[in-house]
Regions:
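Metallocofactor- and cofactor-centric catalytic cores in central/energy metabolism, strongly enriched
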Residues: 1-409, 416-496
Length: 496
């Protein structure tokens, strides 16, 4: 079993694949270094002398600079490494010399649902979407009272509550409206009840304008203040929606019609070595099959955005990527926050030292394929291949944004563990085997086998594709079995 990994030949650190005790001789890639102190799993150890102020190189890229001289064998972490990041950057388009679509592969099929508008779906559910937080508990009771309607090919009745829809103005109000309308359009929802109170800022007329044309058999509306008994009214509407949703049956659909979101949270020092590269390889495989993948978490691209921007398929896509990156930095600065105020305490405990360190691991999920498009918050994926989406690093907010963009399911890598799920089925992918063994009720797929030397990244990615096809065909994720699913909406302004 390998002790450590030397990710790039030019790196001056290695990453411990397992805990390394002080005095242990570590041999990797022709290097032989004795650990001068204990090195926890996922943490970095110097393999060359590093002077005070000299860059610490990991992934072949500076992830910060040393704040003290370090001899080979030294533990390199927050106590002796600091970020190099600052504010906005003026980028230039330098497309990678090997920038080209990957060779095509005949797509496999999954057993999904074909909607009347031609779109594919992997779940056949009824959703209740509240337009305002005031009706959250009403929506929950409607779900509880009508579970008997979940029969035949109908796979669930769910609501996605939130605190917004009123006391918001301007951009926040528009984002809430746009996000909720996007959820109503999601193909995994066979039928939708849009539930409102009646006096909120987000009026029925505004929502209809945002939603645009819709199937009146698929989407129904209920305003609680307009009826004597909202529960009786909802029952009648939900019966109609159930009759509509029950018409759909699973049938073979090519994998090329899938949209898959890619996310990491509770990352550790192995995230960029096991789970995220596996997801990246999977993303490339999806692109080869004509499918679509979505990468977000813009603040966790800071410091590594150049890797992605050089892969933009053309200058127009590059300009959109540049605007997205610097726009998010402006958002931080406008709130008097530094752009590098990341990683989290859990990230640091797992071995991630700086935002560049975290970002270099994060962008591994993007694989090697060209970036075909950059899309805004609440906008749908319209281009096959790899897409970048405007959204924060926050797990719930970014996963909700990917669902709203049309992701049928989400791949979520984690080194620390998390139980949550978006409305779209969310597969948890562990970076290390101890986590998979400890939290077997949370984790769907273990890439710790790569660190254990049992499988290669290519082998793990093929296994992951097989799992995605099974989940798309109806196999439940761990979170689905527990009934976990929720949303969180991005906000930036005042609450009235």
């Amino acid at each position: 079993m390998p002790q450590a990994i030397h990710i790039s030949p030019i790196d001056n650190v290695v990453v411990a694949l397992h805990p390394i005790a002080k005095g242990t001789l570590v041999e990797v890639d022709g290097l032989a270094v004795t650990a001068l102190e204990d090195i926890p799993q996922g943490h970095k150890m110097a393999v060359k002398p590093i002077k005070n102020g000299e860059n610490v190189i990991k992934y072949g890229f500076p992830i910060g600079h040393a704040t003290a001289d370090a001899e080979p064998g030294t533990w390199m972490h927050t106590h002796n490494v600091h970020t190099n990041l600052s504010g906005e950057v003026e980028y230039s388009y330098n497309p990678s010399p090997d920038l080209a679509p990957l060779p095509k592969v005949e797509p496999e099929t999954f057993m999904g649902f074909r909607r009347k508008d031609g779109r594919a779906a992997i779940r056949n559910e009824i959703w209740i979407i509240p337009t305002v937080g005031c009706v959250n508990d009403i929506a929950k009771k409607m779900v509880a009272d009508n579970q008997d309607l979940v029969t035949g090919t109908i796979e669930g009745l769910y609501t996605f509550t939130h605190p917004f829809g009123c006391s918001q103005t301007g951009h926040d109000h528009a984002q809430t409206r746009k996000l909720l309308a996007a959820l109503v359009r999601h193909p995994n929802a066979a039928a939708v009840l849009v539930l409102s109170l009646g006096c909120e800022n987000l009026t029925h007329e505004q929502f209809l304008e945002e939603l645009g044309e819709y199937d009146h058999d698929r989407v129904k509306f209920l305003t609680c203040q307009d009826v004597d008994d909202e529960f009786t009214a909802a029952r009648d509407i939900l019966k109609e929606l159930a009759a509509y949703a029950g018409q759909f049956k699973r049938e073979p659909i090519p994998v090329s019609e899938l949209v898959v979101g890619m996310k990491c949270g509770g990352s550790d020092g192995l995230s960029g070595i096991t789970a995220n590269p596996t997801i990246g390889r999977f993303s490339d495989m999806m692109g080869q099959r004509g499918g679509s993948t979505v990468l977000t978490e813009v603040p966790e691209m800071f410091g590594a955005e150049g890797f992605l921007m050089d892969r933009c398929i053309d200058r127009d896509v590059f300009v959109k990527a540049e605007q997205m990156i610097n726009g998010f930095k402006e958002y931080f600065i406008s709130h008097n926050e530094v752009v590098y105020d990341n990683p989290s305490p859990g990230n640091k405990q797992g071995g991630i030292t700086t935002l560049e360190d975290k970002s270099c691991g994060c962008v591994q999920k993007g694989g090697t394929a060209p970036i075909m498009d950059v899309i805004g918050y609440g906008d749908p994926v319209v281009t096959k291949g790899l897409n970048m989406l405007y959204g924060p690093g926050n797990d719930l907010v970014s996963a909700t944004a990917m669902t709203a963009a049309g992701a049928h399911l989400i791949l979520f890598s984690t080194g620390r563990g998390t139980p949550f799920s978006a409305p779209a089925p969310t597969l948890k992918i562990s970076t290390n085997t101890p986590l998979a063994e400890k939290k077997s009720g949370w984790i769907d797929f273990n890439t710790g086998v790569i660190a254990d030397g049992e499988k290669t990244i290519d082998e793990a990615a093929k296994d992951l594709l097989d799992l995605v096809i099974r989940v798309a065909s109806g196999e439940q994720t761990k979170a689905e079995k527990h009934g976990f699913r929720e949303i969180s909406i991005f906000k930036d302004g005042v609450v009235l």
